[in-house]
Amino acid sequence: MEPLIRLFSAWSGKAPDKIEALPPTGSNRRYYRIFYTSQQTPDRPACGQTSCIGVVGTNRSENLCFTGMARHFASQGINVPEVYAVSEDGMCYIQEDLGTLTLFEAVARGRNSGNYSDEEKALLLKTIRLL
C-alpha cells in the first residue's frame, strides 16, 4: 500500500487522514477508500472531509486499460469515476469516489424476491443502455 500512499501524496500534496480497505471484488485489484481534508479552490468551493478511491492492481496492462477506458468513457459523457492520478509504473491509481452503494446492492430486493420494483428496473435499464 506504500506506493498508493506516495501516489496520493503526490496528487493531493498531503498525507491521507485515514485509509479503509474495501471488501474484495471479482478482480485482482484491491480497493481502498482514502479520506482526506480538502482545501477550498476555485473549482472546488466546498472544503472539509472527503474521500477518493485508491486502487492497487497486480497487472499493469489491465490497470492502464481500465484507466484509459474510464477516461475515454468520460470524454463521451458517460458517468464513470474520474481518474485523478496513475502511478508511473501503472500499478496503482486514484479515482473519484462515487459512494458506497453498488448496483448489485441497489437491486438486491428485486433479485432476492424475483420481483423488481419500477425503480430497480429503471436503474437496470439505464445501466444496460450505458453499456
List each language-model region with its residue ranges.
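Localized chelating/binding microdomains
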Residues: 1, 29-30, 79-81
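Juxta-kinase regulatory segment immediately upstream of eukaryotic protein kinase catalytic domains
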Residues: 1-20
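Short, well-ordered alpha-helical scaffold segments within catalytic/effector domains
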Residues: 2-5, 28, 63, 67
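Generic structural signal for beta-strand residues in well-ordered domains
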Residues: 12, 24, 45-47
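ATP-binding glycine-rich phosphate-binding loop
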Residues: 14-36
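ATP-binding pocket architecture of kinase catalytic cores
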Residues: 34-131
